[in-house]
């Protein structure tokens, strides 16, 4: 492209396939990334060459609206933050699975403790899994101060029956959850290192009500970037982020 003095490129954002091409051309070309919805060709025989020619014709006549594309480091931050969200969802799923195992085993820890993944509850569960048939062990050394007064309730809560199969499943769930916790911590180190140049922007964001966590602020920057000139107005920004969804139903219904 450079040998032919082609500095302007228009491309369709198809799946993930556009990303490596965009990354290669980004430093040397002016790229317009088009949503497939807005460069769809008329019906007929479709080929890659015909599609490329159609997109080129639209671009030549300035009929292609480019998608918002933040700088490369912001895109990397976005990718890592979205993966962090996925890991959090996996953890939530494992928490639910563990609670379901306890429920079918008539272990009602959730009725006594506020968090079955808290230190006291996990210590009790680990002790239970050492020998599921024995629930007569001493609870007091396993619980922290706030739960000392609830020892009778805890004793009743663990008076259930864990089958060998459920015990095995619980061990797998706990191991997977702990692994996810470790991988998430590693990922967060990468995210914090990548977000380090944006400390000023993060500090400004955290002055807004409800934005206290570093990762909440980083998540916002990873999605909308730091250059608000990319959006003509606040309304455009709100629309792009999905806070002002359109009504596509007839008669306003």
Predicted regions located by residue number:
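A detector of single, family-specific signature residues
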Residues: 1-253
